[in-house]
Amino acid sequence: MANVFFDVQFGGDAPKKIVFKLYDDVVPKTAANFRELATGSRGFGYKGSVFHRVITDFMAQGGDFTNFNGTGGKSIYGEKFADENFKLKHTKPALLSMANAGPNTNGSQFFITFVPCPWLDGKHVVFGEVVDGFDTLELFKKNSSQQGKPKTTIKIVDSGVV
């Protein structure tokens, strides 16, 4: 299956690309949700949304394209969908995982890890990893804070498949 890209703008700077490989073989439903939200094929998706939460030495969270603050978003399957499985673990940096509000509450929000996060295993579904644009990942880290408020606006100005 095709990889997914985001063109991410940090403040007023020129957008930087980051590319994700999705684990379609292990979590096909979760991967399909992310890929379709990246393409906007259903009339809604990630393009124009922001990373609202970027925590130093932890992760960058985005995907709320309805409220833009971490309270919204929706999946291609309706509002929320069930945890597909927890076969994959948060064993390394640069993993893609679903953000949620408890069991079986996956929508569109996701996060990219900066470090291994074993305490999230069994609670959040890992569904991909960064394969290109590690310099962009470094910009997320540079714009992180302990409280989670990004130092500048971090916006997905384009997204799709490569």
UniProtKB/Swiss-Prot annotation:
PROSITE patterns noted in UniProt: CSA_PPIASE_1 (PS00170), CSA_PPIASE_2 (PS50072)
GO terms under biological process: protein folding
Keyword terms, alphabetized: Isomerase, Rotamase
InterPro entries, A to Z: Cyclophilin-like_dom_sf (IPR029000), Cyclophilin-type_PPIase (IPR024936), Cyclophilin-type_PPIase_CS (IPR020892), Cyclophilin-type_PPIase_dom (IPR002130)
Record-level Gene Ontology MF annotations: cyclosporin A binding; peptidyl-prolyl cis-trans isomerase activity
Family the entry assigns: Belongs to the cyclophilin-type PPIase family. PPIase A subfamily.
Record's protein name: Peptidyl-prolyl cis-trans isomerase
Keyword hit for Isomerase: yes
Activity modulation comment: Binds cyclosporin A (CsA). CsA mediates some of its effects via an inhibitory action on PPIase.
A Pfam family it matches: Pro_isomerase
Cell membrane is among the record's keywords: no
GO CC annotation: cytoplasm
Taxonomic lineage from the root: Eukaryota, Sar, Alveolata, Ciliophora, Intramacronucleata
Organism: Paramecium primaurelia
